[in-house]
Amino acid sequence: MNLENYKLNTSQVHNNGGTLYKHKNVLYKLYDEFPYFIDEKERNIRLLKNLKLYHIPKIVKIIKKGREFNGYVMEYISNSLTFRQAMYEKISKEKKISAIKDVYITLKQLHSFDICIGDIHMDNFLYVDGNGYTIDLDEIRLKGDEFKFRECYLLKENKNSMISKVATPITDNIKLAIVCLSFYYGVDLETIAVNESLTEVKEKLKEFISNPEEIKKISRVLDMNNLNYLDDVLFLEKEKVLKK
């Protein structure tokens, strides 16, 4: 099979050095050249395959080129939009909350294994009919990773990251919170976080959230010194209100 016939146009999407090909109901992700940390990428994909996380595309198999790891095959999530694409779509609050809870389930699962995502932005989360999916996890960080491996991705993230620090559960949560708040309220808070600061994100939120208690809760989530997951602090309460 000639995969070039199925190559996707992903020039605007972060793919961590890989190229995507869609054939039938699966995606092939192949690395254009062997990255410096190819062993870590292989380890990460094998780990994700074995962990059987909720709300991520199922990893079907590993691809080798000779003896070297060259990519993997995963489930294709059809009819999906990235959170960036879905941000301005007419989607009910109930369905948005449902999708946000899904991506937080995945984040909490990873954190329970001492794994951080690090590479968090609106293009790495998919929405489809009330469901949320986390994608592009081949650069997850394990607690025992060597400093050079972590530093490599810190250098990459300095360019377009909301928080220029080595990934921790707190930075993961804050980044994902900004992604989800952008998606929920239909306001691009991510770009403000990247180009300005978390303080400016909070100021922007005050422009369209009149409830001071809600602002207070979000400020707790965006605290760099404490871990307060967004879905626990804000969206569990919102879900109760919407169900009344």
Per-region residue spans from a language model:
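Conserved hydrophobic "DFG−1" position in protein kinase catalytic cores
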Residues: 22, 76, 126-127
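C-lobe/activation-segment region of protein kinase-like
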Residues: 139-220
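Conserved protein kinase catalytic/activation segment
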Residues: 123-137
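Catalytic-loop of the protein kinase fold
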Residues: 107-127
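Conserved alphaE helix
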Residues: 95-109
